[in-house]
């Protein structure tokens, strides 16, 4: 992902449901390339994270500051990197693709369930596959899950029912590569004083990254 953010132009999308940490991920990507030499502009609704060195604009519909109007201004000003908080409509998506094809690195978010489904979503929005296939560098799908407490977590031998659940999703061959010689072992946390007896300590992001190479572009 860091290699993708270092590209001079193209489009990177972070996808997932509301509350899955997409905005935080976008700012982490921007933070990786945020240097004095780069002109980085954002349009967000609202601005949730302030980051020094960026020119951050917030949507204010009452005075016609929208994703679309901001993108039109951005393209005239020619920044190096553009962050669009969310591609909500066809016009914003079209301008995002145009920007990424004309020498800008663009990062944005979209509400889809997985990285491959994003291709279908863009097509359903009316985007031409030949255009966005050339623009796309990668799609990062993510979810936030609870993290087990590191103080009280313990491993245990998985039950037959739990093992069958893993086989159903992964298949026997893939599961065998993840299993130790003593069999499938999982983790659980009964709770302790450190985690206030919840068994959990914060959340962690799970990611699915689709890097768009020539083969995938041809398929699109």
For the regions a protein language model found, what residue spans apply to each?
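Short, flexible helix-loop junctions that flank or precede catalytic/ligand sites
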Residues: 1-220
């Amino acid at each position: 992902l860091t290699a993708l953010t270092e590209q001079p132009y193209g489009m990177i999308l972070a996808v997932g449901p509301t509350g899955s940490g997409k905005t935080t991920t976008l700012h982490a990507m921007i933070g990786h390339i945020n240097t004095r030499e780069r002109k980085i502009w954002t349009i967000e609704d609202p601005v949730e994270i302030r980051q020094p060195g960026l020119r951050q604009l917030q949507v204010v519909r009452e005075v016609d500051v929208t994703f679309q109007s901001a993108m039109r201004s951005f393209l005239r000003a020619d920044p190096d990197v553009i962050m669009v908080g969310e591609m909500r409509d066809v016009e914003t998506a079209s301008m995002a693709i145009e920007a990424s094809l004309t020498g800008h690195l663009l990062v944005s978010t979209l509400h889809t369930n997985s990285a491959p489904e994003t291709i279908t979503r863009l097509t359903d929005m009316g985007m031409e596959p030949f255009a966005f296939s050339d623009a796309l560098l990668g799609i990062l799908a993510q979810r936030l899950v609870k993290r087990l407490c590191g103080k009280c977590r313990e491993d245990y031998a998985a039950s037959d029912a739990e093992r069958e659940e893993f086989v159903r999703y992964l298949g026997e061959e893939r599961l065998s590569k993840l299993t130790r010689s003593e069999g499938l072992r999982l983790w659980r946390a009964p709770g302790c004083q450190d985690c206030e007896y919840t068994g959990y300590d914060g959340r962690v992001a799970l990611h699915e990254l689709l890097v768009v190479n020539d083969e995938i572009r041809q398929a699109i």
